[in-house]
Swiss-Prot record:
<dbReference type="InterPro" id="IPR023865">
    <property type="entry name" value="Aliphatic_acid_kinase_CS"/>
</dbReference>
<comment type="function">
    <text>Catalyzes the formation of acetyl phosphate from acetate and ATP. Can also catalyze the reverse reaction.</text>
</comment>
<feature type="binding site">
    <location>
        <position position="17"/>
    </location>
    <ligand>
        <name>ATP</name>
    </ligand>
</feature>
<keyword id="KW-0460">Magnesium</keyword>
<dbReference type="GO" id="GO:0005829">
    <property type="term" value="C:cytosol"/>
</dbReference>
<protein>
    <recommendedName>
        <fullName>Acetate kinase</fullName>
        <ecNumber>2.7.2.1</ecNumber>
    </recommendedName>
</protein>
<dbReference type="GO" id="GO:0006083">
    <property type="term" value="P:acetate metabolic process"/>
</dbReference>
<feature type="binding site">
    <location>
        <begin position="333"/>
        <end position="337"/>
    </location>
    <ligand>
        <name>ATP</name>
    </ligand>
</feature>
<keyword id="KW-0479">Metal-binding</keyword>
<keyword id="KW-0547">Nucleotide-binding</keyword>
<comment type="similarity">
    <text>Belongs to the acetokinase family.</text>
</comment>
<comment type="pathway">
    <text>Metabolic intermediate biosynthesis; acetyl-CoA biosynthesis; acetyl-CoA from acetate: step 1/2.</text>
</comment>
<comment type="subunit">
    <text>Homodimer.</text>
</comment>
<dbReference type="GO" id="GO:0008776">
    <property type="term" value="F:acetate kinase activity"/>
</dbReference>
<dbReference type="InterPro" id="IPR043129">
    <property type="entry name" value="ATPase_NBD"/>
</dbReference>
<dbReference type="GO" id="GO:0006085">
    <property type="term" value="P:acetyl-CoA biosynthetic process"/>
</dbReference>
<feature type="binding site">
    <location>
        <position position="10"/>
    </location>
    <ligand>
        <name>Mg(2+)</name>
    </ligand>
</feature>
Length: 400
């Protein structure tokens, strides 16, 4: 065991993912999830030394109680593990324009995260609680907390990619522009792709599809992001689990004026009731859609819309590749595991020189990486993401 482990925290609005990782080799010594915050069934699950555990946190418990449990119950039973923690890495969804890379957390960084709350109203406040509680739980590491921003990797986008065609003053005065998300995943996967393709990162031109309950796609030219599908918030872009992705903005006025829906109701509809859930009217679970694609109209409808949108984005981003596309990469829970999504998308991309291989596609699932195209094809690769490792490595590097 290394003497410099990193505690990685990912505080969501109603959950907290945590892990203790050796940044040198990626080995996980502890991983877990606390969920159902502020509800009677608030609970925590964790895995340590190969064994799985679960406990109730108490009715109404939230981030504070979860971190208290991690420090005073889980780690109290394993002091030798706790003693090895040398830094704490925090996933931060939105850093606005201020943060182009990971940073050690100080008062100025805290203020920057607060300033970006309007762009991530559910996540950024939770991150701030996580930082505060981590400093309380590990007072000796108060100056060893590091923020890793989902938006940072996309800060290389040129103006023509991040500006909306709105009055320019809205950008200058209020920061209304496209920021993107999942940047840590896009960064990690593109670097892994460079190794797989045996190319220097600074010469790498790829399109990365991060497909999970949230989904985004990025165009990476010479190792840097030049465009991405998520916008001011993670609502723009692809069809997602419960998010609509791109829609005609006038639909919002129609829902308000003609159907009498309030702004709050429309927000809930677009973020929590749309996407795959809206299209199936049953579930946002891609596994249901894949299992029932051939037999149920709702599953076929959802899958077809999802893949149509994704293939369209890949086609659009191929125009940004400056004449050379090295590969397309699939990652995230759906990207890594849904052979059907990849098959449907690849079949639409034959014009770009992709030749789909059925057997390879079925083999590259459940944590396995690999090509899903023939030997003569332009490569399409499955590469499992590891955002926690990036966070751990950045935290270790910045606090060394």
């Amino acid at each position: 065991m290394s003497s410099k482990l990193v505690l990685v925290l990912n505080c969501g609005s109603s959950s907290l993912k945590f892990a203790i990782i050796d940044p040198a080799n990626g080995e996980e010594y502890l991983s877990g999830l606390a969920e159902c915050f502020n509800l009677p069934e608030a609970r925590i699950k964790w895995k340590m030394d190969g064994a799985k555990h679960e406990a109730a946190l108490g009715a109404g418990a939230a981030h504070s109680e979860a971190l208290n449990f991690i420090v005073n119950t889980i780690l109290a039973e394993k002091p030798e593990l706790s003693d090895q923690i040398a830094a704490i890495g925090h996933r931060i969804v939105h850093g606005g324009e201020k943060f182009t890379a990971s940073v050690t957390i100080n008062d100025e960084v805290i203020q920057g995260i607060k300033d970006a709350v309007p762009f991530a109203p559910l996540h950024n406040p939770a991150h701030l609680i996580g930082i505060e509680e981590a400093k309380k739980g590990f007072p000796h590491l108060a100056d060893k907390n590091v923020a890793v921003f989902d938006t940072a990797f996309h800060q290389t986008m040129p103006e023509e990619a991040y500006l909306y065609a709105l009055p320019y003053n809205l950008y200058k005065e209020h920061g209304i522009r496209r920021y993107g998300a999942h940047g840590t995943s896009h960064f990690f996967v593109s670097r892994e792709a460079a190794k797989t393709l045996n190319k220097p990162v600074e010469e790498l031109n790829v399109i990365v599809c991060h497909l999970g309950n949230g989904g985004s796609i990025s165009a990476i030219v010479n190792g840097q992001c030049v465009d991405t599908s998520m916008g001011l918030t993670p609502l723009e872009g692809l069809v997602m689990g419960t998010r609509s992705g791109d829609i005609d903005p006038a639909i919002i006025f129609h829902l308000h004026d003609s159907l009498g829906m309030s702004v709050e109701q429309i927000n809930k509809l677009l973020t929590k009731e749309s996407g795959l859930l809206g299209l199936t009217e049953v579930t946002s679970d891609c596994r249901y859609i894949e299992d029932n694609y051939a037999t149920k109209a709702d599953a076929k409808r959802a899958m077809d819309v999802y893949c149509h949108r994704l293939a369209k984005y890949v086609g659009a981003y191929s125009a940004l590749m400056e004449g050379r596309l090295d590969a397309i990469i699939f990652t995230g829970g759906i990207g890594e595991n849904s052979a059907l999504v990849r098959e449907q998308v690849m079949k639409k991309l034959a014009l770009l020189g992709f030749e789909y291989d059925h057997d390879r596609n079925l083999a590259a699932r459940f944590g396995k990486s690999g090509a899903i195209t023939t030997d003569n094809s332009r490569p399409a690769l499955v590469i499992p993401t590891n955002e926690e490792l990036v966070i751990a490595q950045d935290a270790a590097r910045l606090t060394a």
